Amino acid sequence: MDFGSLETVVANSAFIAARGSFDGSSTPSSRDKKYLAKLRLPPLSKCEGLRDSISLEFDNLCSEQPIGKRLFQQFLKTDERHVPALELWKDIEDYDTADDDLRPQKAQAILAEYLDPQGTLFCNFLDQGMVARVKEGPTGSQDGLFQPLLQATLEHLSQGPFQEYLGSLYFLRFLQWKWLEAQPIGEDWFLDFRVLGKGGFGEVSACQMKATGKMYACKKLNKKRLKKRKGYQGAIVEKRILAKVHSRFIVSLAYAFETKTDLCLVMTIMNGGDVRYHIYNVDEENPGFPEPRAIYYTAQIISGLEHLHQRRIVYRDLKPENVLLDNDGNIRISDLGLAVELKEGQNKTKGYAGTPGFMAPELLRGEEYDFSVDYFALGVTLYEMIAARGPFRARGEKVENKELKQRIISEPVKYPEKFSQASKDFCEQLLEKDPEKRLGFRDGTCDALRANVLFKDISWRQLEAGMLIPPFIPDSRTVYAKNIQDVGAFSTVKGVVFDKADTEFFQEFASGNCSIPWQEEMIETGFFGDLNVWRPDGQMPDDMKGITVEEAAPTAKSGMCLIS
């Protein structure tokens, strides 16, 4: 075994040990006591001023923010007047994610318990006309069956109950968490593991948050390389989009900070590797995927693209190596450095961006384009997943970009026998040369794609709720990445000097914690439950008063929590 191979074996062993069962988020022994001690709720004297600086908008505070939602629901549970609305809210959410065979029974239970005046939790705040329409309508497994009721319930809760919440101890507890969330964070909070890959401006490595033990991927953008190659705009756009979009089909940004040499984006770690690696490297004798596996990934990519396009974001770099698998075998799209956000009133953009072989004809011709370019790239990606080669060149064929451009613009695509008629037809609709005729995002949704016969066996509701079992589940003992020596190294960048404007850009970039992923981390790793301790008499907890109590180090399954 040469030194390079030995280095990979050692690095892989350390990485696998750190991530534990797979995500490394529930191993108390992996937590650093020094940083663990810093995760403590502050006294109210330090955080009450946040009341004037945070958004007090109901949806953001009580629905979108995970800790905010939990605390608001805990508050509602303490007042019997609000319990019917709380339980209806929770039961409708449960109905929306339930298996189809369970939904009729759950629907009947909702009708009997909350809409019948004789029900134990009758919701008298609901408009009786709306209730009558729901009762008269079809019951069973219909999507959106109870959405009018849910909207009315949240509207009710956003009035009097919300105002009561803002004056409660539960809201003060929320302010404590927001103070903790806002504390500075930097590279010293993270432990680096092996390099997973390389991008245009730096490496991506596995890392572990020292306080919680949660594993992440850290994308390091070399400052000098960014400046020399004029990469500031792409870096800040990627960071802003990742922080803005929260989707189970797009990698999430948890932290952003700077080091002496790099700008760092700490994101969802995708332990299953990228789709390109699986196409060509997992089974080299039989590259490519069976069609059902390719269809499953395509469906998840469609949902991710829809979430981007609904926020007016053109991705521009969809390809197999930017589609990553998580622990369970579900995918997320990543690397949004080439994405562009359309301004209000702007329907198209212009500019040469993307990867040769994946760029749409209108983009290659220098024309204005819209979201449709991403669906052309989806067609190329689906084709490659099935055929183990691109649609415009043979596997291993070296083609000059000029020739490749000509093929994309004018030549028809040929399909090998591996394609069923349905997958061929779907690909052809995506690889349509005319963007006006191309299948894609229409009227704010991807429903036209979902309706295609290719997805007849996909339950889109369950897919988007994360309830389907993927066709391939990664092995927790395997590192799905190239050997370290095959990743390659960057050459040293010389002759770059930073000025005041550079420093200001770096400081703007290093914004610290991202609210929703940070709160999810606190919940998933058990810290929310461990620190959210209340007195049995309902009086103000000691931590709010600033009274320190000697506590044991929290664990993911601690019994300290009274309400979680």
From Swiss-Prot:
Ranges where the RGS domain occurs: 58-175
- SUPFAM superfamilies to which the protein is assigned, alphabetical: Protein kinase-like (PK-like) (SSF56112), Regulator of G-protein signaling, RGS (SSF48097)
Spell out which residues are annotated as carrying Cysteine methyl ester. Answer: C561
Annotated region described as Interaction with RCVRN, given as residue ranges: 1-15
Question: How might one describe the regulation of this protein's activity?
Answer: Inhibited by RCVRN, which prevents the interaction between GRK1 and RHO. Inhibition is calcium-dependent.
Tissue specificity, please? Detected in retina (at protein level). Retina-specific. Expressed in rod and cone photoreceptor cells.
Q: Per the database record, which ranges form the AGC-kinase C-terminal domain?
A: 456-521
- Provide the function of this protein: Retina-specific kinase involved in the signal turnoff via phosphorylation of rhodopsin (RHO), the G protein- coupled receptor that initiates the phototransduction cascade. This rapid desensitization is essential for scotopic vision and permits rapid adaptation to changes in illumination. May play a role in the maintenance of the outer nuclear layer in the retina.
- This protein is called what? Rhodopsin kinase GRK1
Quick one: which gene encodes this? Grk1
